Amino acid sequence: MKIVIAPDSYKESMSAQDVAAQIEKGFRDVFPDACYVKLPVADGGEGTVEAMVAATNGRIVNVKVTGPLGDNIAAFFGLSGDEKTAFIEMAAASGLEQVPAQQRNPLLTTSYGTGELIRCALDHGVEHCIIGIGGSATNDGGAGMVQALGAKLLDASGAQIGFGGGELDKLASIDIGELDARIKKCRFEVACDVTNPLTGEQGASAIFGPQKGATDQMIEQLDNALGHYAEVIRHDLDTDVEQVPGAGAAGGMGAALLAFCGADLRQGIEIVTEALGLDEIVRDASLVITGEGRIDSQTIHGKVPIGVARVAKRYDKPVIGIAGSLTADVGVVHEHGLDAVFSVLYHICSLEEALDNAAENVRMTARNIAATIKLSQGLS
């Protein structure tokens, strides 16, 4: 019997690797001779680098980059085991958590550090970059990123503009003569689970600006600046990105990756499961187990359990979900490939207690599921 264990992390509690390990422990108590394949998974957001590195026997590369406020910060990216693919999280270099709440101002914050991460990855000779762009602190249209990669964003006098979304209204022309030539030889895939355009009522500034510290006045200024930026890109690069779905992701980073890197914007879970070769792994499985911190009606929107289930159902495999908690509307997940779902919580308790006992609760839940499966085999 082959059992594939492919969970996401339980946010603020357990990594995907730890969840998978505890599920295996529980099942081994009942099925000691089964073949277990543990495959930590992520949806393109937090934890993606660690999950992809673990699954490909790769490594983490620690680097110093320019933070959102222009200071020097510690960041990281991942390399696959064959060192042909880089795994990058924008949040590691240009994330909201890098900026204290009282200093959040998207007129000033820059994505320059994300460009430095990409440049470091190219220095390692990668042929493929997978970039997660969630959790950003910026609204600069990815301008900082492309500046780090060699593009010159020039004002009317021919001087380079500064950092931050507030500088984009000064942009007069774009010179890509010194843009890193290695970009053309690298395939860029962007984990992007939003479809917002660059500008407008559903654009980057209006929808995501407030969480980055933007006031109503800033939102209007930033939206106008991004519109101007898009017009210069259209004129100088002959590329229209303003209303492309996903262009507004991460404060317009989606637009920059499209225009300057020729990136493909895709659902994060699709990129991850494809890169991990999940199809081939589950093809001959007897059972697939997945999970995340909470399984609810939102799980069907690009989350790991449904992404894993969709792959498994291509081969008619049974799928079980194990979650920290379930909600009353969880039934909808059964229509999307999860055959059964279980919570690891056995009684009403505080969040602190639930987090403290998470590992043992996952193991015990997995053991009970395995025992139930074994009983059912005997009954049949």
Functional labels for PLM-detected ranges:
Residues 1-133, 137-380:
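N-terminal loops that bind phosphate or other acidic moieties
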